[in-house]
Structures are given as structure tokens and as C-alpha cells.
Amino acid sequence: MSEKLYPVLPEAKKNTLIDNETYLEWYEESVSDPDGFWAKHGRRIDWFKPFTKVKNTDFNGDVTIKWYEDGVTNVSYNCIDRHLKSRGDKVAIIWEGDNPYIDKKITYRELYENVCRMANVLKKHGVKKGDRVTIYLPMIPEAAYAMLACARIGAVHSVVFAGFSPEALAGRIVDCESTFVITADEGVRGGKPVALKENTDTAIDIAAKQYVMVNKVLVVRRTGGKVSWGRGRDLWYHQEVASVEPHCEPEPMNAEDPLFILYTSGSTGKPKGVLHTTGGYLVYASMTHQYVFDYHDGEIYWCTADVGWVTGHSYIVYGPLANGATTLMFEGVPNFPDQGRFWEVVDKHHVNIFYTAPTALRALMGAGDEFVTRSSRSTLRLLGSVGEPINPEAWEWYYNVVGDQKCPIVDTWWQTENGGILITPLPGATDLKPGSATRPFFGVKPVLVDNEGNVQEGVADGNLCISDSWPGQMRTVYGDHKRFIETYFSTYKGMYFSGDGCRRDEDGYYWITGRVDDVLNISGHRLGTAEIESALVSHHSVSEAAVVGYPHPIKGQGIYCYVTLMTGADAQDPDELRKELVQHVRKEIGPIATPDKIQFAPGLPKTRSGKIMRRILRKIAEDESGALGDTSTLADPGVVDDLIENRQNKK
């Protein structure tokens, strides 16, 4: 843990929206009078019918979470229409293509027309309020248009990251019974095409076998690559939008009407459809965007995430646009054409606020400072980090080399389930400690509990829970409220359990220590070990598999797989079989789930009741076999010796 303290920079303090005094005052009000506080801040968005009820939440029993429940509004209206009068000609989205010579600026007025046209196309093909629309698009402006068009007509979008495989896409189509898909002919990433339409066709075939029929596929022409065509089903986006009006009335939505479903990995099998609703989500996303990034009108803001992840939803699209900001969307990758790309984009578009993930920073740090220092970065004012805890070395590099010691770093902790940032510094209010997410945002009440559920006071380590609701919180797991309660509210009664471990220091600062359940954090993206295990076991040579994380210098965590083979399968060349299994997992889930290490084992360490002792597997994967603890409960302690002997990452 870093003991270094970086006081608030004078420059950051000078123009800040929130200084320390204001933070302490607002925070106190937000936790002592949540109704009064959130009533006031709920008015930051426009309501067609104002709310009279603010907070109606209960973390016990059947768990109900409702905010502003009698208010009526529309997210698309708040992100576009209400800005037209005062800033219609202001740039809403700067799009930077994969190719550094291609970019596009879209004003709020152009955004309005594009979104209205797409909304009218959806309506023309029978999409109604409450219908689920699957969006499987690269980082192109049409991805934002599609999300906002769904919000405009009251359809519920489910964005699937364009790096996911056809199998993963199919699972998400089936779970929410989506009959309309929006995709592109191909994506472009690092100069290479990504076969999105082909993947979509495969996914639709898989979904059909599970009796979910996709009726229409709207295809954006991105590359002009050759694609197969389903007559009567497939529609070209450019042809469809040309035939409809550029105006579409926003559907009046109740604050608790669903806005989107976003699938996230859990510690058990299939991904969970996290459901966010309309009013509270937008209040929270826009408020955190404004105050965490200390956003001032006219600034250029860039979050490098993909819209396939929650960070892209809240901090590329909804938060910034609700605030009338200029938000940058980047199609490419940090190392194409070379490792200086991020900083060239910063210079090219005069970026003031930059928000990225530690995994990208670690990779760029390894490439050397000259890729950074050849750019000026003189417009940068604030840096942010998201996705996983940032190690102090990467933090220092980010602060000293990228930010030239003049940009505060907001190290933000939050999750898909949270809708927006929960623990974070505020640039004009919070002294910084490298590696610490520091203090809770307004209305957020973090609690550390031990494994028995006892609340820990003062300096402590524990499981991170939140003891009361905030407006951006997810409402349920789509179609499975029981799973929602079991996952988040059954471990510690009356509290939301994050699944993360955490330490609180003597200044009341929070330090996230990583997952405490069977979920991996790979490059800032969550993957369930059960998901990867079931992909491995679906291969004909594999009898059993156990997956754990281990420290990885770039990705934060790497994927370590222990595999027991079917009888006879061990006759295969182990290196060939490893390659085959890696490809198999990539096909089942996507490149994000590529195993880093595969260890073949005659057996796995199990208790007499048949439970795999993951703690032991984790220690071996971390090359800490001296710290295995008690192995006396194992059915066959001899298995452990073989695992240690053949471990894949001996130091």
C-alpha cells in the first residue's frame, strides 16, 4: 500500500465544482437525509411529469428498489432534445476511427436527426415499448444512435460487446428473447476486420435451436466487406434511414421503466442480465459524470471504454450527453498504429479529461515513455482510471509521465450493477493516495464486514458492502429476481454485497483488494470462472476443469486453467491440445477469455464431499505452494504434490 499523499493541486482547487468543505457538507446531507438530497438532485434532468416520491427501497425480504417512481421522463429527450435550443450546433460526439486519418464530428442537431431516423426504422419494423433489441456493433456513432433510439421509443437495449463470440451473443439473445438485432457488416480493430454479420448469422441459428427467433437484422455498412444476406430478414441501415422522417416524438417513460439490460459474469454459470431503469439511472450517471470529472461546459471528454461494457453506457453515452458534453468515441486500440495512439488522439482533438483502464496503462508503460513524451498533451486537465484497482507503479507513471504532474487522477470504483461511480476522489476536494479509490460519492454508504457478517469499524479489512440504495443501482436480474436476491443480498442481510474485498485506512480511504468470489477481473472486464470452466468441459477431451486467477503484469489477472482429461485423451501431444483448448474457449466465449496457462492434472484437490478446493489451486497458480494451509480435509492429498510439481509458472 502506498503511503504517499498527493494534496489537491492548486489549479484543480481554483475552478472546481466541489471543494472539500462542499464534499463533506453534501455527503453528510446525502446520508442523513437521502430523500431531501436526491429530491434536489433529481431535478438535474427534465421531467415530463415531476416526481413526488423520491426513495422507496428495501434491501430485506423481496428486495425492492424504486427511485422517483411516479415521475415521467425520457432518456433520449434528456440527452438530446433539451440541448437543441442552447447548443444544437455544439459537437456532441467526436468519432475517431481505427484509422488515424478518419474521424467525424456529430453536433447535437445531427445527433437528434440520426437518432430519430433510427427510432423510426425500429418502429416501422414493429419494435414497441418494452421490446428487447440486441446491439452488436463496433465503436461507431451508430452504436450510440441505436442505444438512444431504443431509449426514445421505450425499447430495452441489450448491447453485446463486439469481441464476444457467436455462442456468447446467442446466449444473450435467448435470455432476453430479443427478436431484433442491430449489427454491422464488419468491425475494424487494429487494422483488422471483425466478422460481425457472420457472427450474428451464426448466433441467430444457435438461438433458433433454442426457440428464440430473430425477425429482423439491421446492418450498418462499416467496411463494405462481403456478407451473406437473409432475404426478408436483413435490412441495410443506410437504405432504411433514408426512407423515414428525421423526427420522432420521445415516448413518455415512467422512472422505473427498464432502460437497458447488460450481461455481466457471475460466479455461477451463465451471465446475468443486469437491469437498469430510466430515471434514477440517468440522474446518477449524469451527476457522477459532472462532479467526478469536474466537467465544465465546452470541455472535450474522452472515455476509452467500449459501449459493450457499462463504462461505455454511463460514461461515453448517457452521462456526458445528459450533461450536454462533447464525448469522444474511439474505434481503435491503444497500440495501433503504435503505442503512442492515445496521446496523439489527445493532441488531435484537444482532450481535457481522459478516462481509461489500468490494463492499457500497464501495457503502454511497458512500451516506454518516448511514445508519451513525443506528444504535447498540453490540453489534459484530469485523468481517470476504471475497471480494476490501479497498482501504485502504474498510478505514478500515469501521474508523472502522462499528466506531467499537473493532472489529478480519479481512481474510480464501481460495477455494472451500480450504474455509476461509487467510490472516487473528487479532483478539487480529495487528497490522493496512489492505488486508493479514496472516499464514497454522495449517498453511498460503504461498510466492511468480516466473513461472519460483523461490521468492521475504523481501520479494517473486509468484504465491501453498501448499506443503503443509491439512484443508479440495478433493480433486478432480468427474468430472475430470485437470483438477484441470492447473488447480492443473501450473503450479508440487509446489505448489497459487491463481491470485492477492501481495506479502509486511518484516513477513512478505501483500497479495493480485488474479487473475493469466483469472478476474474481480466483487463478490467469481469469473467466468471464457471463460464470458462463450462467452455473447457464442453471440449470432447476434457473431463473436468477448474479455473482461477493469478497475478498478471499487464492484465492484472491472468486465467490459469487446471484440466483433467478424458481417458485416452492424454495420448495427444500436450502442446497441441493446449492450443486446441485455447481456440475452443475463444470460440465459446471470445478472445477476452483466452486462457494464459493450462495445466493438465490427473485429478483436482477435492474435499470428501466432492467440493473443489479453489484456495489451494489459487495458491499453486500464484506459485505460493508453501502457503497452502490445511490440506487434511482433502479426499486425496497426493493430488496436490502432482499439481505443485507440474505448475506452469515456476518463478
UniProtKB/Swiss-Prot annotation:
Principal EC category: ligase
Q: Which residues participate in Mg(2+) binding?
A: V537, H539, V542
Gene Ontology CC: one annotated term:
cytosol
Reactions this protein catalyses: acetate + ATP + CoA = acetyl-CoA + AMP + diphosphate
MF term (GO), any: ATP binding
Which positions does UniProt annotate for CoA binding? R189, G190, G191, K192, T311, N335, S523, R586
Q: Which cofactor does it need?
A: Mg(2+)
UniProt keyword annotations, A-Z:
Acetylation, ATP-binding, Ligase, Magnesium, Metal-binding, Nucleotide-binding
**Sites of N6-acetyllysine modification:** K611
| PTM note | Acetylated. Deacetylation by the SIR2-homolog deacetylase activates the enzyme.
A single GO BP annotation from the record? acetyl-CoA biosynthetic process from acetate
Which of this chain's residues are annotated to bind ATP? G387, E388, P389, D411, T412, W413, W414, Q415, T416, D500, R515, R526
Matching HAMAP family: Ac_CoA_synth
Role this protein plays: Catalyzes the conversion of acetate into acetyl-CoA (AcCoA), an essential intermediate at the junction of anabolic and catabolic pathways. AcsA undergoes a two-step reaction. In the first half reaction, AcsA combines acetate with ATP to form acetyl-adenylate (AcAMP) intermediate. In the second half reaction, it can then transfer the acetyl group from AcAMP to the sulfhydryl group of CoA, forming the product AcCoA.
Name under which the protein is recorded:
Acetyl-coenzyme A synthetase
Q: Which organism is it from?
A: Brucella ovis (strain ATCC 25840 / 63/290 / NCTC 10512)
Q: What is the lineage of its organism?
A: Bacteria, Pseudomonadati, Pseudomonadota, Alphaproteobacteria, Hyphomicrobiales
